[in-house]
Amino acid sequence: QAKPVLVLLRPENGLQYNIEDIKKFITTRTAAIFINSPMNPTGLLLEDRFLKEIAGLGVPVISDEIYHGLVYEGRARSILEFTDQAFVLNGFSKRFAMTGLRLGYVIAPKTCMRALQKLQQNLFIIC
C-alpha cells in the first residue's frame, strides 16, 4: 500500500522544490517520486538544476508532463532529458483541446513495458 508524502513548495524558493526537502523523505520503501511541470494552475516550470538532481537520486521518477504543449514563456524540459529511468505521463487531450477524448500515453523504461501492457489490458477491456 502506497503512502504519499507531500513536499511543500515555498515562496522563498520561488515555488521551486528544494532537493534537500525531498531527500529527507526518501527511504528504502520509496517506490517513486511524482513531479509535474509545468504545474497547474501556476504554469511554473521546474528548473533544469532540479530535474538533474531529482534524476540522480536513484529513485524512479514519474513526471506528469501533460501541460508541456501549453508553455508560453520559457521551455518545458522533460525528465527524459536527464534520465531514461523515468515514466512520463502525457497526452493529446489538453494540448489540442480534445478533453472529452482523454487521449493519454506513458513513456516508460523498456524493462517496465511488459508490466504496463498487462495493466493496460486489464484497464481498457470493454464489456
Segments from the language model and where they lie:
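Short secondary-structure boundary/capping segments
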Residues: 24, 78-80, 124
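Phosphate-coordinating loops and pocket residues in cytosolic domains that bind phosphorylated ligands
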Residues: 68, 72, 81, 118
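Substrate-binding/gating loop at the entrance of the active-site cleft, primarily
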Residues: 1-4
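Structural signal for conserved beta-strand scaffold positions within catalytic alpha/beta enzyme cores
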Residues: 6-8, 78-81, 88-90
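Conserved core segment of the aminotransferase class I/II
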Residues: 84-127
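Short, structured coil segments at secondary-structure junctions
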Residues: 57, 82-84
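Active-site phosphate-binding strand-loop segment of PLP-dependent enzymes
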Residues: 9-74
